Amino acid sequence: MSIISTKYLLQDAQANGYAVPAFNIHNAETIQAILEVCSEMRSPVILAGTPGTFKHIALEEIYALCSAYSTTYNMPLALHLDHHESLDDIRRKVHAGVRSAMIDGSHFPFDENVKLVKSVVDFCHSQDCSVEAELGRLGGVEDDMSVDAESAFLTDPQEAKRFVELTGVDSLAVAIGTAHGLYSKTPKIDFQRLAEIREVVDVPLVLHGASDVPDEFVRRTIELGVTKVNVATELKIAFAGAVKAWFAENPQGNDPRYYMRVGMDAMKEVVRNKINVCGSANRISA
């Protein structure tokens, strides 16, 4: 088995009306927990790492882990660069083997965003690497960056059409009312806006900020054309909460084989639920 481009996964999802879950990873345990469930449920998966992830553990180490686990679990997977902001950083990581990258220029004006994304697309497509970009801007906290509500804005459908045409991007992350992190109240998702974007944009659409969004809302976005669903915060909360509870019950405990497994098992339940919500189970042949 191998690490592949997300475009092959997303093309199948778009053709068959489901979404591929993209789970953020941080170390060997998070990769293993996610793939244990994906292997069992035969779900395609995208493992995503932010620049902050690769400050914690080198890309080359993450890549080696993903390659090994792909063989262990006999399934293809995509390793994805999430929320990267420079061509130089992406270029280095693509040369190291990655075949999926998100270039995030959403904080730039439209024309600057287009210019940056187009430069990344031109390079990545020469390396069989798919490219995701974002138009519109989500609020909340992602990695080390915080975007307040006043700076967030939703994706304009006609701008989305122009953006895809000008850049040649493979998938588009849209801002329709979700945010990174948790919500203080139920998010207001602009389903009509999503439907209008889907009418004029042919490439796969991506939902960022799916943690803590009601399952029925996520399912509705998939019905309207979302083919990649990003999940990060819920995984971390489940893992950390279970480990904290274990230490509360075992204050003298010190063996990572036990407390890490508790965290992994809690994370696995989140993964299992998201696969069911995305409708991605049994999409990989045995």
From Swiss-Prot:
Q: Which residues form the active site?
A: D82
The UniProt entry, under SUPFAM superfamilies, shows: Aldolase
What does this protein need as cofactor? Answer: Zn(2+)
The reply to whether DNA-binding figures as a keyword in the UniProt entry is no
Binding residues for Zn(2+): H83, H180, H208
Which positions are annotated as binding dihydroxyacetone phosphate?
G181, G209, A210, S211, N230, V231, A232, T233
InterPro entries in the record, alphabetically?
Aldolase_TIM, Class_II_FBP_aldolase, FBA_II, TagBP_ald_KbaY, TagBP_ald_KbaY/GatY
- List the Gene Ontology MF annotations in alphabetical order: tagatose-bisphosphate aldolase activity; zinc ion binding
According to its UniProt entry, the protein's GO biological process terms are: carbohydrate metabolic process; D-tagatose 6-phosphate catabolic process
The protein's annotated pathway: Carbohydrate metabolism; D-tagatose 6-phosphate degradation; D-glyceraldehyde 3-phosphate and glycerone phosphate from D-tagatose 6-phosphate: step 2/2
Top EC class of this enzyme? lyase
Entry's EC annotation: 4.1.2.40
Q: Which domain of life is it from?
A: Bacteria
Q: What does the similarity note say?
A: Belongs to the class II fructose-bisphosphate aldolase family. TagBP aldolase KbaY subfamily.
Provide the assembly information: Homotetramer. Forms a complex with KbaZ.
NCBIfam families, per the entry: cbbA, PRK09195.1, PRK12737.1, PRK12738.1, tag_bisphos_ald
> What is the name of this protein?
D-tagatose-1,6-bisphosphate aldolase subunit KbaY
Which source organism does the UniProt entry give? Escherichia coli (strain SMS-3-5 / SECEC)
Point out the gene that encodes the protein.
kbaY
